[in-house]
């Protein structure tokens, strides 16, 4: 959602935000990455991320969005865990009455990159279009 941070600084605002497989915070994403787990006891990942200015704190950014927010996430996403997208939605829902979450079931085998190929994808897009009209 980093480009959204730039959009939030502009006077022009989009009609809605559509997020596909987002994460809530970079620190949570890094800590959920399998190769990072052995290092958790050796280093403070959060401090390192903050020191190199890579916090990508989407939870904070999303609190400033008043437009509708639509989040899509596949349950079998192996890159960004589903629970991180859901956690971001929970924050959005608390701050915006227009937040919607569209989960895609694990049995569809969509992973991180293939939500667009799901049969229900067109239905989700139509819902978004109808809400934004």
What does each of the following model-derived ranges do?
Residues 24, 52, 76-77, 108-110:
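Conserved beta-strand elements of beta-rich interaction domains across eukaryotes
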Residues 2-61, 67, 114-117:
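Hydrolase active-site cap/lid region
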Residues 82-89, 94-133:
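C-terminal catalytic histidine-bearing segment of alpha/beta-hydrolase fold enzymes
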Residues 18, 70-72, 102:
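Hydrophobic/aromatic beta-strand patches that form the interior of the parallel beta-sheet core
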Residues 64-66, 70-73, 77:
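Short beta-strand/loop motif that positions the catalytic acidic residue
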């Amino acid at each position: 959602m980093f480009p959204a941070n730039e959009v939030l600084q502009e006077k022009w605002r989009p009609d809605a935000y559509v997020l596909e497989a987002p994460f809530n915070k970079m620190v949570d994403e890094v800590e959920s990455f399998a190769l990072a787990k052995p290092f958790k006891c050796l280093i403070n990942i959060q401090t390192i991320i903050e020191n190199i200015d890579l916090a990508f704190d989407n939870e904070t950014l999303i609190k400033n969005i008043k437009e509708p927010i639509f989040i899509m996430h596949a349950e079998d996403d192996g890159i960004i865990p589903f629970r991180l997208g859901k956690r971001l939605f929970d924050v959005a829902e608390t701050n915006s009455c227009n937040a919607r979450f569209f989960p895609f079931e694990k049995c569809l085998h969509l992973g991180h990159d293939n939500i667009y190929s799901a049969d229900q994808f067109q239905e989700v897009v139509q819902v978004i279009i109808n809400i934004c009209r």
